[in-house]
A protein has these predicted regions:
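Acidic-and-aromatic substrate-binding clefts and catalytic sites of carbohydrate-active enzymes
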Residues: 39-44, 68-75, 98-105, 127-134, ...
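Generic structural signal for well-ordered alpha-helices
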Residues: 47-51, 77-84, 109, 138, ...
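Divalent metal-coordination and catalytic microenvironments
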Residues: 12, 54, 62, 80, ...
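Short, well-structured secondary-structure segments
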Residues: 53-54, 58-72, 79-83, 88-97
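Generic structural signal for hydrophobic
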Residues: 54-57, 112, 145, 176
Length: 287
């Protein structure tokens, strides 16, 4: 048992109650990605059960993401908002929009940010080979996020679903960070097999961070762990991509990393609270 005098923040999670799970698992491209995670898969859990699991492992707040890819809505903003309404102290929302209809997308971002959502989520792989994160397709969204002062989480690294990985090369974020120095950018999913490139960007740019979603601690690349523990502990956010990574592994495997306690607190809580403008932790948790 480990007692922490702070609550953990999960920077990328998703609701997975049955209708969402059915939608997700019925998509062959997504089902392939689900299979890569082994026994957990995606789904079928009530939001109440999700909160119980958070309690058991000391997770105070999770950023719940809507998932919109092209014409396909896997998790709607309304579904995320319903979860937040049930547990307003435990969840915040992340926005996802189709950039091909820019005016509609900008209005949606404004609406959901006004409703309390704290993040904009971008997965460029849903828009083919020709729209990486530095494509002009995304620039209106970046400008709106700057205006609203919300961070943007951008998927980096290979894709689990059968969709293009090219847009996940972290170097594309270099141009975005230079063009929008006011924009807080989070490179999600570590960036493997280009994790050193992602680390370089987080080290170089004051406005660039990394999150660990979709990776259990036992699968963190060795050089990434050194980056976290020694070089830039203030630039990495803990995340799971829940339910793909459940908390028994996402938290249960942390001890093997042998992180300095001050680094662990930054990683598990303080960095995310800063980036997402969350309240300070007022709870102690035992897990």
């Amino acid at each position: 048992m480990i007692t922490r005098d702070y609550g953990i923040v999960d920077a990328w999670a998703m609701p997975s109650y049955p209708p969402i799970a059915e939608r997700w698992n019925s998509d062959p491209k997504r089902a392939h990605g689900v299979a890569l995670f082994g026994e957990n898969g995606f789904g079928g859990m009530s939001i109440e059960a999700q909160v119980e699991e958070m309690d058991r492992w000391g997770v105070d707040i999770a950023i719940l993401s809507a998932i919109v890819e092209s014409d396909d809505v896997k998790i709607s903003h309304e579904e995320v908002a319903e979860c937040i309404s049930k547990f307003p102290d435990r969840f915040r929302g992340a926005i996802a929009v189709d950039p091909r209809q820019p005016m509609k997308a900008l209005k949606e971002i404004e609406f959901w940010a006004a409703a309390g959502f704290v993040n904009l989520k971008i997965c460029s792989y849903g828009y083919g080979f020709d729209n990486p994160p530095n494509s002009k397709l995304w620039y209106p969204l970046y400008a709106k996020a700057c205006e609203l002062e919300i961070p943007v989480t951008i998927q980096v690294g290979h894709t689990g679903p059968l969709l293009p990985s090219e847009g996940g090369r972290p170097i594309y974020l270099d141009e975005v960070a230079l063009t929008f120095p006011e924009l807080v950018i989070i490179g999600a999913h570590i960036g493997w097999p280009w994790e050193e490139e992602m680390g370089m960007l987080a080290w170089k740019h004051p406005n660039v961070y990394i999150d660990t979603s979709a990776y259990t601690p036992s699968r963190y690349p060795e050089r990434f762990v050194k980056f976290l523990n020694r070089r830039a502990p203030h630039k990495v956010l803990w995340a799971t991509d829940y339910p793909a990574i459940r908390y028994d592994r996402g938290i249960g495997e942390l001890a093997a990393l042998d992180l300095d306690p001050d680094v662990e607190r930054l990683f598990l809580s303080d960095n995310a609270r800063k980036v997402f403008n969350l309240p300070p932790s007022s709870k102690a948790f035992t897990a």
